[in-house]
Amino acid sequence: MNHLDRLQRQISYEFKDITLLKQALTHRSAATKHNERLEFLGDAILNYTIADALYHQFPKCNEGELSRMRATLVREPTLAILARQFKLGEYMALGHGELKSGGFRRESILADCVEAIIGAISLDSSLVSATQITLHWYEKLLREIKPGENQKDPKTRLQEYLQGHRLALPTYDVKDIKGEAHCQTFTIECHVPNLDRTFIGVGSSRRKAEQAAAEQILTALEIK
């Protein structure tokens, strides 16, 4: 159990029921009792926690500015950064196929795991505890975030960049949908006519998958 003791120190929370943490770390490819329900719960808690923090931190910002900052803080790449800080990839339980394809490094899987841990903390202790721990994780990010252009989501930023350069807009096509209706994984293929490449995004919703693909294109174009 030493490895989970180490993880609990990294996330600044000690579980009373360690099975909740184990479930939060279990991808659906590894077991029938996986982390997707916990992820659903954690996603809602995370969005509320960050929205509440931003509301009080920026009393003069309008709804649009607050929404963009929240989107930046709860999006997949940001959650994946937290996951890497906790080294979650070393603790996750993945099926053979996901392990072989490097699932422990995939941003979508890492981000989902962070949300699942938030959900697990709320069940193990309370909603208040989950909120407090989440705010602790986000302390530096909340301190550094500012209203501004870079808070727009990846799809919006990509569209504005292409329009500004009079380039054709991207197309997003669903290439694959896996899982039951309540816990699906979407694979989106994004093509920009002026780029000789196709980009793939994966997410727990079509929107998340499209945003992930757009983020890859922005990175390839070196657009911050």
Curated annotation (Swiss-Prot):
Q: What class of enzyme is it?
A: hydrolase
Q: Which reactions fall under this protein's catalytic activity?
A: Endonucleolytic cleavage to 5'-phosphomonoester
Supply the InterPro entries for this chain: dsRBD_dom, RNase_III, RNase_III_dom, RNase_III_sf
Q: What is its EC number?
A: 3.1.26.3
What cofactor does its activity depend on?
Mg(2+)
Q: Which Pfam families match?
A: dsrm (PF00035), Ribonucleas_3_3 (PF14622)
* Protein name listed in UniProt: Ribonuclease 3
Write down the species. Answer: Mannheimia succiniciproducens (strain KCTC 0769BP / MBEL55E)
